[in-house]
Structures are given as structure tokens and as C-alpha cells.
């Protein structure tokens, strides 16, 4: 009997929510949100990040001023232990999710590489 792919996806969602790195990420995010200075800096970082992504997606040039502002925010971020912990934990979780994505995409990869060998 074939498993419903959506059921498997919901199982994966639950597994991610139960993952230790995800739990640590939630705790780290709550710590950032509870500290006004950290929250303001994190919000500033996210706004800047989204603005730069939007510019790139629209084909707009990232100016030297944009780069300078981004560097200044990054320096301040690195000095905030709460945000640093949040970002390190998020990076670990992103590695796990990337690994899972590779596993999920393996059938397509095999299909297309088999087609190229024909």
C-alpha cells in the first residue's frame, strides 16, 4: 500500500518540530523577542535583509551605501549573544532541512540522470 505523500510530509513537519535544534531555535527566538535591544536589532536586520533580497529579485543594483549599512548591522549582530545564538541554531537547522531536501529530491535526480545516460 502506497503512503499518502501529504501524510508523510505532516510526519516530517512533526519531526522537525520535535527536533532539538528547532526547540533551541524557539527558545533563542523567544529570548531575542524578550530583550528590547535584541528585538530591535533583529528586526532591523530582517528588514535590511528583505530589502536587499527584494532589490536583487527586481534586478536593482545593490549600492555601496546598502553594503555599508548591511556591514554595520552585521557587526552589531555579532556583538549580541542572543541573536548570535539564534542565527547559529537556525544555521544548524537549515543544514538538517537541506539534507532532508536532498533526500526528497533524490528520485527526481535519479530520473533525470538516467535520462541523460540513454
From Swiss-Prot:
InterPro entries: Com_YlbF, YheA/YmcA-like_dom_sf. It comes from the Bacteria. NCBIfam families: PRK13676.1-4 (NF010211). Belongs to the UPF0342 family. This is UPF0342 protein BA_0863/GBAA_0863/BAS0820. It comes from Bacillus anthracis. The lineage of its organism: Bacteria, Bacillati, Bacillota, Bacilli, Bacillales.
Amino acid at each position: 500500500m502506497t503512503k499518502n505523500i501529504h501524510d508523510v510530509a505532516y510526519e516530517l513537519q512533526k519531526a522537525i518540530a520535535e527536533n532539538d535544534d528547532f526547540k533551541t531555535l524557539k527558545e533563542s527566538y523567544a529570548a531575542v523577542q524578550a530583550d528590547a535591544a535584541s528585538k530591535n536589532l533583529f528586526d532591523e536586520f530582517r528588514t535590511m535583509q528583505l530589502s536587499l533580497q527584494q532589490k536583487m529579485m527586481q534586478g536593482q543594483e545593490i549600492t555601496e551605501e546598502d553594503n555599508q549599512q548591511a556591514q554595520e548591522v552585521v557587526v552589531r549582530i555579532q556583538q549580541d549573544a542572543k541573536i548570535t545564538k539564534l542565527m547559529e541554531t537556525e544555521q544548524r537547522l537549515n543544514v538538517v532541512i537541506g539534507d532532508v531536501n536532498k533526500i526528497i529530491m533524490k528520485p527526481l535526480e535519479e530520473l533525470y540522470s538516467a535520462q541523460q545516460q540513454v
